[in-house]
Amino acid sequence: MKEQSRKNDRVEILGIELEWKLRRHDTVDQYCVLAATMPPGAGVPAHQHPQQEAFFILEGQAEFAVENGAGLAWKEVNPGDVVNIPPDVIHGFRNESDRDVKLLLTCEAGLGRFFEEAGTPLTENQSARANVSGEEIQRVLEIAKKHGQRFPAPA
């Protein structure tokens, strides 16, 4: 079995910690697998991108919104639930509980490129910050746009 790359295993994006399990170069540039920890109050606003992704909820209770033709409605998800996001579908997620949410994320390699560029490396003793500055949000949004992501105006 080939040893996977372990360089910068953990990064933070918008207060969410991502730990690489498989990088795109480990899968012949096909897909990525990441473990995510989303602390209370963290989340990603409604957005869309050309890559498919899927979330498997491991621990905690999160809220996901996925466009369904009638709009965007938030739905509670729990351990064992899977949320599949087809390409170009508007979606968002958040943790409004008082406990961390842990999930497994599988995505196409193109989305992995975004995570590689936008992620801020975490040292062994660091964890994701609870509060994200406006400057950091703007930095991530600019990188997201460069990678084909769109953030529709709230309805």
Where are these regions (language model features)?
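A short, N-terminal "cap"/entry segment at the start of jelly-roll beta-barrel domains
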Residues: 1-31, 127-155
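Histidine-centered catalytic micro-motifs
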Residues: 45-52, 89
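Glycine- and acidic-residue-biased ligand/ion/polar-headgroup-sensing regions
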Residues: 51-63, 67-68
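A hydrophobic, small-residue-rich beta->alpha segment in the mid-to-C-terminal subdomain
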Residues: 113-127
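Ligand-binding loop in jelly-roll beta-barrel domains
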Residues: 79, 87-112
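Conserved short histidine dyad/triad with adjacent acidic residue
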Residues: 17-20, 34-48
